[in-house]
């Protein structure tokens, strides 16, 4: 990928989700006409398109996205291409349930909504790497590509064992030892001092959730 973005125009556009309308090509055709009429010159594609790009594991369908890239380019527009990890496909949750998010009550979520995944899951990370690699290889040098949109919003904390271990690892790097952590969080209050790193759990309505330092650190790492 050697192309650089030098468009001097004011970028005008927004998120566009043609993957939701693939059964209605007449709608997609009208969309392009409306964009030109409104002088839209930039669209973000693929934010929640993972299931349209990889409908089953390892089977990729890029034809529809090829057409959108070419159509946007033909009208003189730019594409901001999103990595689609904000909304994983159903098959991923079904085959690899560890990718589903665990809430602060320790309950494993089922598939649904968005940002409902475990960021720490090795399987989730590998599947994200695979789809992102495919997108980069296919569209990295397309003349319409202006920039990348990484995933989506920050949300969907997970409290599974993977995330709790990452939480403790992060705290060990920050505080070095339990004595420093106990002091920073003032864990002598109510007699809750830690004596082992395995005792350090993230805030939970079922346990500790009134320690301000703990809450602040959780917001900093955002597990």
Name each model feature, range by range.
Residues 18-20, 49, 85-87, 152-154:
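Active-site-proximal loop/turn and secondary-structure-junction residues that shape catalytic pockets
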Residues 7, 11, 46, 56-58, ...:
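Aromatic- and acidic-residue-enriched carbohydrate-binding clefts of CAZyme catalytic domains
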Residues 68-75, 112-150, 173-188:
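An active-site-proximal structural segment forming one wall of the substrate-binding cleft
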């Amino acid at each position: 990928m050697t192309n650089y973005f030098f468009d001097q125009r004011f970028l005008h556009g927004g998120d566009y989700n043609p993957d939701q309308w693939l059964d209605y090509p007449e709608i997609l055709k009208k969309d392009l006409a409306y964009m030109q009429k409104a002088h839209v010159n930039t669209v973000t594609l693929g934010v929640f398109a993972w299931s349209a790009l990889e409908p089953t594991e390892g089977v990729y369908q890029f034809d529809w996205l090829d057409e959108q890239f070419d159509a946007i380019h033909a009208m003189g527009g730019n594409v901001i291409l999103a990595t689609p990890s904000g909304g994983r496909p159903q098959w991923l949750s079904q085959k690899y349930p560890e990718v589903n998010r665990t809430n602060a009550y320790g309950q494993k979520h089922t598939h649904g909504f968005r940002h409902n995944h475990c960021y720490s899951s090795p399987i989730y990370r590998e599947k994200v790497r695979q789809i992102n690699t495919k997108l980069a290889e296919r569209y990295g040098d397309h003349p319409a590509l202006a920039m990348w949109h990484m995933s989506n919003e920050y949300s969907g904390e997970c409290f599974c064992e993977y995330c709790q271990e990452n939480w403790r690892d992060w705290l060990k790097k920050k505080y070095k030892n339990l004595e420093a952590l106990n002091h920073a969080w003032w864990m002598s209050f109510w007699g809750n001092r830690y004596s082992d790193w395995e005792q350090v759990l993230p805030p939970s309505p079922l346990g500790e959730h009134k320690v301000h330092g703990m809450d602040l650190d959780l917001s900093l790492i955002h597990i």
